[in-house]
From Swiss-Prot:
Species this chain originates from: Schizosaccharomyces pombe (strain 972 / ATCC 24843) (Fission yeast)
Protein known as: Multicopy suppressor of sporulation protein msa1
Gene3D superfamilies per UniProt: 3.30.70.330
Lineage, top ranks: Eukaryota, Fungi, Dikarya, Ascomycota, Taphrinomycotina
Disordered: annotated span: 30-68, 237-292
Biased composition regions of type Polar residues, renumbered to the chain: 36-45, 277-292
Molecular function terms from GO: mRNA binding
Biased composition (Low complexity): 54-68
One GO CC term on file: cytosol
Domain of life the protein comes from: Eukaryota
Localization terms from the record: Cytoplasm
Alphabetical list of SMART domains matching this protein: RRM (SM00360)
One Pfam short name: RRM_1
RRM domain sequence ranges: 79-158, 365-441
One GO-annotated biological process of the protein: negative regulation of gene expression
Length: 533
């Protein structure tokens, strides 16, 4: 099936061409399901969620869930506080009520959530309606007594920043290009330029808008990465957590005290650590995991991750292509400034990508639903609850002994799965709020290459000594009786293997040697001794 697209021959700006490709994706939204065959070369695209991610989401009233002010106002992440050291002897309902009554004195609240970690220690997230009220509560309620315990308060770590850089051999991207590129996806809180890398750090107001922008632009002409909430000021990176909104940590106070005691001692400054870590893949909206760094750009498959209050962690496979490649962009080397405006950064430019953690893959058609009541939750109730977002074609419920059940649901479209993840799904039959996120797949679950490689992770080799993929493939059968192969020798892709090898030729490489990715084995001649010599 062929879908006509606007001509890009008269467009001169890379952003205009990318906008034309974005318009092309909207033409596929009216195609009925099933009209695209498996052999069709066209791609199913996700329309940028203009209303779902940026519009106000009404919050239903529910005393058990801690919602205090049912209105259409969306709570900003900067107005959300993390409260720890709560009394573990009280139930979640009692803690929700006490935390609600305690923090209402600083301002109106939108909701309060009480959760427990793996050690059954309770903690809470308090969402204020106003940022000033949250800042005031953070400074005044710190280390105060609630239910007989000194509580600890921090700013909730809601990561919502992406990094956009200039494409190779393309003109430098400008702030105007960033504004035009990200305008459809939601409100941007801050745009910070990184002059020494020709890139921008873009922090959205809401996390789901950052995920929507990353997902839609991942396969565009601009390299897009997931980043931490940082700012770039006076040539230095500054994490968002070190702003006046959050209290200083003990490490900074210890460094200050040590500096006073050793003021006469010369200090040797070591290179600063990497200011922020990025990931080549986005998270889903509700998961929980740790930080991740960028995966190598030369990997054969793109990888994707997710967290609710942090950056993604584990390795994941790619989503379907969101945007087609744009081969018609002008090719040309970008001009470097000659006025000396480029200063050498005071930190290592990039960590070794060979040891970079990779975020996990997600299935854009399926969702994970956690914290289900094992007694009241049934297959019929779960399908009926999520059918408002789209047609549910599969549902599997997994019951655990003495633990909440969980389920996997598969929709007939990506838009339905995205709406289910972003929606505030609540059930009257559930005692706890549901945990809804995209289904995470195993690292190699979506990979089906022509040649299966062993599951050796690349980080097991140092960066300068990483063997190519063709050095870890199955051992081939001898091509003739005179050919001898090293035990770790692997077959080469079709077309790279010679039809015949001269007799008495041997390969001379092994996986321990340093070889480029496009390595072709070399041979040397070995003359066997003649009989009688």
């Amino acid at each position: 099936m062929v879908v006509s697209s606007p001509s890009v021959s008269l467009l001169h700006s890379p952003v205009e061409k990318l906008s034309a490709q974005l318009e092309k994706t909207t033409l596929l939204q009216d195609i009925p399901p099933g009209s695209l065959s498996e052999n069709d070369n066209s791609t199913t695209f996700i329309k940028p969620p203009l209303e779902t991610a940026s519009s106000s989401t009404p919050i239903p009233s529910s005393s058990s869930s801690g919602v205090l002010n049912p209105s259409s106002v969306r709570g900003k992440p900067v107005a959300c506080l993390f409260v720890a050291s709560l009394n573990s002897s009280r139930s979640e309902e009692e803690l929700t009520a006490t935390v609600k009554d305690y923090f209402q004195q600083w301002g109106p609240l939108l909701h309060v959530k009480v959760l427990k970690d793996w050690l059954q220690r309770p903690y809470s997230f308090v969402q204020f309606q106003n940022t000033d009220d949250a800042s005031k509560a953070l400074s005044e309620a710190q280390n105060t007594i609630l239910d007989g315990r000194h509580i600890r308060i921090e700013r909730a770590k809601v990561n919502r920043t992406i990094r956009i850089s200039s494409a190779p051999h393309q003109p430098y991207i400008t702030k105007k290009d960033i504004d035009n590129l990200l305008e459809p996806y939601g409100e941007v809180e801050d745009v910070t330029e990184i002059p020494d890398q020709s890139a921008f750090l873009v922090r959205f107001v809401y996390r789901d808008e950052a995920i929507a922008a990353y997902t839609a632009l991942k396969h565009s002409a601009w390299p897009v990465l997931w980043a931490e909430n940082v700012t770039y000021q006076n040539g230095h990176y500054k994490k968002k957590g070190s702003s006046p909104f959050s209290p200083p940590n003990a490490h900074s106070r210890r460094r200050k005290s040590q500096g006073k005691d050793q003021s006469n001692t010369p200090v040797i400054k070591a290179p600063a650590p990497i200011p922020f870590s990025v990931s080549s893949d986005p998270p889903s909206t509700m998961g929980r995991s740790n930080s991740a760094v960028q995966s190598p750009s030369y990997f054969a498959h793109s990888l994707v991750n997710s967290t609710e209050f942090s950056t993604p962690n584990e390795s994941l496979s790619s989503l379907p292509s969101i945007l087609p490649s744009i081969p018609s962009l002008e090719s040309g080397k970008a001009e470097l400034p000659t006025d000396g405006s480029f200063e050498q950064p005071g930190y290592p430019m990039n960590p070794s990508m060979m040891f970079a953690a990779m975020p996990p893959p997600i299935d854009p058609y399926s969702i994970f639903v956690g914290q289900l009541d094992p007694v009241n939750c049934t297959h019929y109730l779960l399908v009926d609850l999520f059918s408002k977002y789209g047609k549910v074609i599969d549902c599997k419920i997994i019951h655990q002994s003495k633990k909440p059940a969980f389920a996997f649901l598969r929709f007939d479209s990506q838009q339905a799965a995205y709406a289910a993840v972003c929606g505030k799904t609540r059930s009257p039959h559930q005692k706890k709020p549901l945990r809804v996120e995209f289904r995470q797949l195993r690292p190699m679950q979506q990979f089906s290459p022509q040649y299966q490689y062993p599951s050796y992770p690349y980080p097991m080799f140092p960066a300068p000594f990483s063997p190519p993929r063709n050095a870890m493939m199955p051992i081939p059968a001898p091509m003739d009786q005179f050919s001898t192969f090293h035990q770790s020798m692997a077959t080469l892709p079709p077309g790279a293997v010679p039809t015949s090898i001269p007799q008495s030729y041997y390969p001379i490489y092994s996986p321990e040697m340093a070889m480029p990715q496009s390595y072709s084995p070399m041979y040397y001649t070995h003359n066997p001794p003649m009989d009688g010599n």
